[in-house]
Each structure stands twice: as C-alpha cells, then as structure tokens.
Amino acid sequence: MKMLGEPEFKENILYYSFLNELFLILIRNGFSCSHAKLILDETRKRGLECSGQFEVISNSVEAPEPESLERIAKTLFTPRPHWGRLVAFLAYLAYLQKNSTEKLFWNDHLKKLKQIVKCHIVPWTLGPRDPKPKQRPFDKLPSAFYFLTAAASCLTLLLLYFRTTQTK
C-alpha cells in the first residue's frame, strides 16, 4: 500500500502525522481503507488547489479551537452533508497544519474530529439516502403486462369472430 504522504510533504512530519490521524479516524468509524485513502488523496489535492483561498481565510482567523470545530461542522454538514463539504473541511484543516511550524491539532481536536465524523458523516454514509425509496419503474410491470395481454387477446378474438361472421 502506498504511504499517505506525497514525497514533497514527507519533510513536514506534522502534516503527515495529521493526515495519518485523519486516516485512522475515518477507518475506525467504519470507512473502508480504500474510501479513506480516496478521501485523503482528494483532501491533499484540494488543499493544494485552494491554497490561495485558504491563505486568505487563515490570515483573517486563527486556528480553530475544539469547540469551534464542532460549530463549523454543524454549519457545513447541516441539513445534509456531501463529499465536497467533507473534503473542503478536511483540506482546510490539513492546509492549516501543513503551513504551521508547530502542532495545531492536539488530542482535544482529534477527539472532536472523531465525534464530528461519528455524529455527522457516518450516519449520512451508512443510512439510506432517501427515507422513502423511490419505486422502480417496472415494479408494476407484471400486472400491467397481464392486463394488456388479456385486452389484446380479447380484441383479437372479437376481430376473428366478426371476420368469420362476415364471411358466412
């Protein structure tokens, strides 16, 4: 299995260890290794692509406290989360750690991230997408098919009957 860090990031051990912690949080909450790896690969890509936007945000606010992580997550993932918001949230946190020379996210932050994933993301990924599943278009096919077949048979019998009576 390929290691999580890209070669240019291996110099930044704090960034690499933060990504590893995120990877473990996702796996411990029921994500498969391949899905967790895809999420973190996308997180790294988006972190690089959006670094200019993240720089503007990080200049205007300080690194989030554990309680503010919960508030941010509630606003991002309510009423319903989606993958783009999850990746953007993780990419911003990874960007903050990558550009910092000290550890930003301590055990309190990681516990809060575990709680966020468990409360907001896991129910969304494991639960049904729609509480009332849509009916497939061919669920009622047998009854409609039988009705149309019977109607066509009756019509055929009537046509045959009238044709035979007209020829007599």
From Swiss-Prot:
The keyword Membrane applies. It is found in: Host membrane. InterPro entries: Bcl-2-like_sf. The keyword Translocase does not apply. GO terms for cellular component: host cell membrane; membrane. SUPFAM superfamilies: Bcl-2 inhibitors of programmed cell death. It is a single-pass membrane protein. It comes from the Viruses. The chain crosses the membrane at residues 143-162. One of its GO terms (biological process) is symbiont-mediated suppression of host apoptosis. Keywords: Host membrane, Host-virus interaction, Inhibition of host apoptosis by viral BCL2-like protein, Membrane, Modulation of host cell apoptosis by virus, Transmembrane, Transmembrane helix. Suppresses apoptosis in host cell and thus facilitates production of progeny virions. This is Putative apoptosis regulator A9. The lineage of its organism: Viruses, Duplodnaviria, Heunggongvirae, Peploviricota, Herviviricetes.
